[in-house]
UniProtKB/Swiss-Prot annotation:
<feature type="domain" description="EGF-like">
    <location>
        <begin position="263"/>
        <end position="303"/>
    </location>
</feature>
<feature type="signal peptide">
    <location>
        <begin position="1"/>
        <end position="36"/>
    </location>
</feature>
<dbReference type="GO" id="GO:0005886">
    <property type="term" value="C:plasma membrane"/>
</dbReference>
<feature type="disulfide bond">
    <location>
        <begin position="293"/>
        <end position="302"/>
    </location>
</feature>
<dbReference type="GO" id="GO:0046597">
    <property type="term" value="P:host-mediated suppression of symbiont invasion"/>
</dbReference>
<keyword id="KW-1003">Cell membrane</keyword>
<protein>
    <recommendedName>
        <fullName>Tomoregulin-1</fullName>
    </recommendedName>
</protein>
<feature type="glycosylation site" description="N-linked (GlcNAc...) asparagine">
    <location>
        <position position="55"/>
    </location>
</feature>
<feature type="disulfide bond">
    <location>
        <begin position="91"/>
        <end position="121"/>
    </location>
</feature>
<comment type="subunit">
    <text>May interact with ST14.</text>
</comment>
<feature type="site" description="Reactive bond">
    <location>
        <begin position="188"/>
        <end position="189"/>
    </location>
</feature>
<feature type="domain" description="Kazal-like 1">
    <location>
        <begin position="90"/>
        <end position="137"/>
    </location>
</feature>
<feature type="transmembrane region" description="Helical">
    <location>
        <begin position="323"/>
        <end position="343"/>
    </location>
</feature>
<feature type="region of interest" description="Disordered">
    <location>
        <begin position="139"/>
        <end position="161"/>
    </location>
</feature>
<feature type="compositionally biased region" description="Polar residues">
    <location>
        <begin position="358"/>
        <end position="372"/>
    </location>
</feature>
<keyword id="KW-0732">Signal</keyword>
<dbReference type="GO" id="GO:0141069">
    <property type="term" value="F:receptor ligand inhibitor activity"/>
</dbReference>
């Protein structure tokens, strides 16, 4: 037998081949997951376990929040705490309100050291205490030597050797013992004893300034005359000598860290109960505690009853009540006066009629016959 020729199928028409190809391509594109396989990883496809692009963005935000709060990004006493679905760096500082000012390395004055640490945590910046007491502006015309520490307007001037000299002290770099030198001469002042905030008596106010300059600490005049046993040093705060410069106290209690400047401050905790019937306030200018007494009380500690309260002009809140009471009283008085006037006018007429009837009843028969 001879070799058989291979079986050949009849050639398909060209139109049929094109039709089959187009159907296969259309079927391939319509298969589920085909579009996802064509898109790059991480592209705008559906998130695993999610419901769309919105869930993708939320997931990314959550992951970014978790990555942000860690030991490297939440420092200076901050604690990572849950805030909704993410984590947040929280600065939990319970600061007291006592006025013990400190100067920060950023040039800002803070009410006390706790407020400084809270500001460092809030801004995540390294803020340290450069000096005890408020920051002072350098108003002198010095030579400009030395570095300016901090960016604030009231920054300390850091000298090359001495450090910050305060209370009118000058840096003497040529001296053997480099330090702050006080050139205050009190020889021309007369004897005028005063009591200072450190509990010591000085012959005149100039010696108080000299002692403050030498000790490089704030010493203020409390009152004229020598100190007595009743003087309490703890009642005093610290302020600048001569009140030529009032520092700006940074309070991190609100979002803007507004500057706390004012002539009155809340009294410290050791003065609780200082005012019996009133509010205790610490006056910055005099560095003394005072009482704002309630209505009806007077005295240094609001312990006395004010008997002249009826003659005191009422406050705005009570003025409306006083006016209403006055109007009601005036109306009542007017009604009473009207009633009294009506009664007094009717009474004489009634009396006259009664008298006439009584006179007619007294006539006898003889008098009546005579009249006839």
């Amino acid at each position: 037998m001879g070799a058989q020729a291979p079986l050949r199928l009849p050639a398909a028409p060209p139109l049929a081949v094109c039709g089959y190809t187009s159907v296969l391509l259309l079927f391939a594109f319509c298969l589920p997951g085909s579009r996802a396989s064509n898109q790059p990883a991480g592209g705008g496809g559906d998130c695993p376990g999610g419901r769309g692009k919105s869930n993708c963005s939320e997931l990314n935000l959550r992951e970014s929040d978790i990555r942000v709060c860690d030991e490297s990004s939440c420092k200076y006493g901050g604690v990572c705490k849950e805030d909704g679905d993410g984590l947040k760096c929280a600065c939990q500082f319970q600061c007291h309100t006592n006025y013990i000012p400190v100067c920060g390395s950023n040039g800002d004055t803070y009410q006390n050291e706790c407020f400084l640490r809270r500001a460092a945590c809030k801004h995540q910046k390294d803020i340290t205490v450069v000096a005890r007491g408020p920051c002072y502006s350098d108003n002198g015309s010095g030579s400009g030597e030395g570095e300016e520490e901090g960016s604030g307007a009231g920054a300390h001037r850091k000298h090359s050797k001495c450090g910050p000299c305060k209370y009118k002290a000058e840096c003497d770099e040529d001296a053997e013992n480099v330090g702050c030198v006080c050139n205050i001469d009190c020889s021309g002042y007369s004897f005028n004893p005063v009591c200072a905030s450190d509990g010591s008596s000085y012959n005149n106010p100039c010696f108080v300034r000299e002692a403050s300059c030498i000790k490089q600490e704030q010493i203020d005049i409390r009152h004229l005359g020598h100190c007595t046993d009743t003087d309490d040093v703890s009642l005093l705060g610290k302020k600048d000598d001569g009140l030529q410069y009032r520092p700006d106290v940074k309070d991190a209690g609100d979002e803007r860290e507004d500057v706390y400047i004012g002539s009155h401050m809340p009294c410290p905790e050791n003065l609780n109960g200082y005012c019996i019937h009133g509010k205790c306030e610490f006056i910055y200018s005099t560095q003394k505690a005072s009482c704002r007494c309630e209505s009806g009380y007077t005295g240094q500690h609001c312990e006395k009853t004010d008997f002249s309260i009826l003659y005191v002009v009422p406050s705005r809140q009570k003025l409306t009540h006083v006016l209403i009471a006055a109007i009601i009283g005036a109306v009542q008085i007017a009604i009473i006066v009207a009633i009294v006037m009506c009664i007094t006018r009717k009474c004489p007429k009634n009396n006259r009629g009664r008298r006439q009837k009584q006179n007619l009843g007294h006539f006898t028969s003889d008098t009546s016959s005579r009249m006839v």
